[in-house]
Structure formats: structure tokens, C-alpha cells
Amino acid sequence: MKTIAIMNQKGGIGKTMTAASIAYLLGEEQGKKVLLVDADQQGNVSMLYDRYKPEGIGMSELLERHRSVGGSYKTTDLIQTTPYHNVDIITANGYLMRTNMNLLLNEKEDQILRFAAAMLEVQDVYDYCVVDCGLLLDMTVTNVLVATDLVILPVKIGGFEIEAIANMDEQLEDLRSLNNRIRMKILMTMRQKNKTSLQVEAWLKESSGQDCFVTAVRRSIIAEKATMQRVPLPKFSKNCIVTQDYRNVVTELLKDMEG
């Protein structure tokens, strides 16, 4: 199982839509077995997959009450099926805020290795684990990154994207002593075809030294409508331009991850 974390510390850049769309397309169209993990206390990707419950069990229990840390839950106890072929989910809700605090106060060495330990139980069940991370590099996200193969960094051109990339680079470098295989790939989202955007896009791809997806995800009102309807974009509109872009992203992703 390969783990892909979608994260950026800036909101409004299509992070959750990216996670939801990649998971859907890998499962429904590519026939891959996918475990979608919500690691954001807002629970937005859980909502898009119609599995959000304010009092439900999921990511909090995985990190605090899993049998690998003396609890009673197996990983499979916390996995739910979704309405979509080949995609299962571990949900999140507001309890993750409490979980982050509890892990921060816990001085045991395993506090940032808990997600990795729990995923060992299902590593032969799924082809991909796709994680929608929260905006903060908290204990939940740190746990995820320790187990991650690829970080996809969605970047919206037009404000502080250079700083966001530099910050993420620095944070991942700090984690490489625990996970030396982790790497980052930039995905341009909400692309608008104007001079400034095209210049920054060209710099990112050609001169920044960063690994970037060739595909840039365009901006469309259809994506916003899908979010309002709480449905993954490729299900809401199979042939819209943004779905086509994400389909191309998945093609690139599979070539990258599988050769």
C-alpha cells in the first residue's frame, strides 16, 4: 500500500476536493483498492463521502485507542464502506482537536508512530491510502507524514505560494530522520489563464527545482457546486473540465508511483 497525503497549510486551495477526487478516480475508474483517510477535524472529506458523524468513531480512535497502543480497536473496526466502488474511509470529526492535545501531552515515544502502526494491519488490503490532512502540522498530520510516501501540495497561484512550498520543504526535511522515503509533488489548482499565473506556473515547472504535476487543475464553478452538494466532483460531473484535469493527474500519479 502506498500512502499519499494531500496537504497545505493554506485553506481555499482545493485540498479536500483533490483528495476526494483522486480517491474516487483511483477506485472507480482505475480499479485500485483505496483507503481514504480524513485527518482533518473539520471532517469535510467525510462529508463528501456521506459518512460524517459528529459523534462517530474514526481517526481519533485510531490514534488513541488502537490495539497497538493498548486500546481495543483494530484498524478494520474503524473503516467504513462508501457508496463508491473500491473506496473505503476512516472518518474524522471535531474530536481530533482533543486527540491532538492528548498526543501532545503524551511523552511516550510512539506518539508519532501510531498511524503507521495501525496501517500495518491493512497494508496488504489496499493499493493506496489517500489522506486529506488538516491545515496545521499537528500531531495527527505528523503521524500521517511519518507513514507517507508522497505529499501532494495543492498550490493556487496568486498569493504566497512560494512561501508555502518553502515551508513544506523545510517541514518534510525535519521528518526525514523518521521517514526517508517521503517526497513532495506540487499540483497547481484553481488555475486561471492570465499572464501572472502562467509566469508563476512556468517558473514552478522549469526553474524552481520542485517536482510538479504537468497537469494544472483549472478553476470551475462546477467544483464549487459539487462541494455544496457534498458529492465527490467526478461523481457530480463526470466530464467537466476539472474532472478531466483530475483524471489526468491520476494518470500522472500512477505512472509516478507504479512506473
Language model features by range: what are they?
Residues M1-G259:
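P-loop NTP-binding core
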